[in-house]
Amino acid sequence: MGFSSTVGSVLILTTLLICSVYLYSSVDVVSSKFTNAYSQHAESLQGKMNENLELVEITKLGDDIVLKLSNNGTETLSCEHWTVMYNGTPKAYIANQSYVAPMDTVQISINGSTPCRISLISEYGNKYYYKL
């Protein structure tokens, strides 16, 4: 009777040890992913707060509408990550440079006619609306 209870308790303790090692490794991986996602979210919110685009000028050149925007924020922005919507539909655009440094300007031209509503969604999700 004494031998079988000893073997049973050793077997249960070994099983608990193996399960706890597996559980610890799973929790460690999830915790690492959670921490990484949280830091990315914090960086995104910081970028959103530090971003500020201002419309300087709108001109109509033939079939194109040219927007001149000034980056008055503290973030360097990538024009490739922007979305331009023309009357509520996404529209292809051409920017005269790939990146806009703080206190720099960029020109965006889209094919369209006036009157219209143009919405610019930046890489951090800020929305800027313009009505022509």
UniProtKB/Swiss-Prot annotation:
To M.jannaschii FlaF. The keyword Acetylation applies. This is Putative flagella-related protein F. Residues 1-18 form the signal peptide. Its main location: other. It comes from the Archaea. It comes from Methanococcus voltae. A lipid is attached at C19 (S-archaeol cysteine). The modification N-acetylcysteine is found at C19. It is found in: Archaeal flagellum.
